[in-house]
């Protein structure tokens, strides 16, 4: 399902990020005890009154060294391009500024719903001053104190009221995948090679992909696929795609819509922090993942080259131990024929269900190999486990005390489940729950 998008805009220091974190709530602070897994704070998903939406903090995309007005223009451009609803944040302490009026004039022309959030209204006496913001011509101002959580419910009500009423329902039989990675890793050339047609215009200059469309195709066995392009959704007019953070945001949106993600690495440049960041987001989102090393034809090789590359990838992406690695060349089409079959296989892993009886046999065998740990004389007791969902496969393990389930033992159980059932290319989630 494609979620509607809400963008937060406003000049610096009005509290955009604080409001973003307040709306996102606990969803923003996802932490896993594995190095390299981080969720970027410029993009997340949120929910209010049973309506889900994607949330963008455009201020997090800015180049802080850019001129003040250029930053604001940049934000407004992103909002106009990406958002279904725009939240315009101003400061109740400072009143209406020239910069606020400048942004308002831009937003007024978008013909998109704009919610005016007057932030930093931290006490009732300040409410009398918010009426000055009617001069911006954007409708009723909403008094907010994002630090204290006051008024955010009213803003959320307004967001939900203005979200598109029809949400695209996607065919569950179609496998959706995206190619993500830094500019100039060869995503466009890979797309062209996979499709066998020049559907996306590619250039050797980084950041020159302009098209923004999903591409549907069918393999020889009748399996339907949708390839999601990371060049931006509903793109119109100029898009600020020269910043790495904007590229990160677009990749995150593509990941959210995908079942399987192809993490593309440029063999000529190796692994960068950007790659780890995006891969971490895909891992946390529970997506199937394939690590694709492109431009393999440009690398000088000996008998140890592949093994050395694989070892380095496993070391740098320790949290992706389940993800297969494939070395390809879009230019020579080396191993590209393997990709559709790998995507299909990993999609099947994402949707695999294990019966409780078979699962519990594996859990009991695991306990026999490695008995449950103790803490202060009390031993963890596992009663049974059951699979509760797919995409990604998620299992609940019922225990006597959740606190006794140490991270290392949970990882051991995960490894035993993987050995028994495979689950190639997909994260699996294990949740300890106290039996009532």
Curated annotation (Swiss-Prot):
Keywords in alphabetical order: GTP-binding, Nucleotide-binding, Repeat, Ribosome biogenesis
UniProt domain KH-like: residue ranges: 352-436
Residues at which GTP 1 binds: 10-17, 57-61, 119-122
Binding site for GTP 2: 181-188, 229-233, 294-297
Highest taxon in the source lineage: Bacteria
GO MF term set: GTP binding; ribosome binding
UniProt keyword annotation of Repeat present: yes
UniProt-listed GO biological process terms: ribosome biogenesis
Presence of keyword Repeat: yes
Limits of the EngA-type G domain: 4-167, 175-351
InterPro entries the record matches: G_ENGA, GTP-bd, GTPase_Der, KH_dom-like, KH_dom-like_a/b, P-loop_NTPase, Small_GTP-bd
NCBIfam families: GTPase_EngA, small_GTP
Subunit structure of this chain's protein: Associates with the 50S ribosomal subunit.
Task performed by this protein: GTPase that plays an essential role in the late steps of ribosome biogenesis.
Stated family: Belongs to the TRAFAC class TrmE-Era-EngA-EngB-Septin-like GTPase superfamily. EngA (Der) GTPase family.
Protein name: GTPase Der
Organism: Streptococcus thermophilus (strain ATCC BAA-491 / LMD-9)
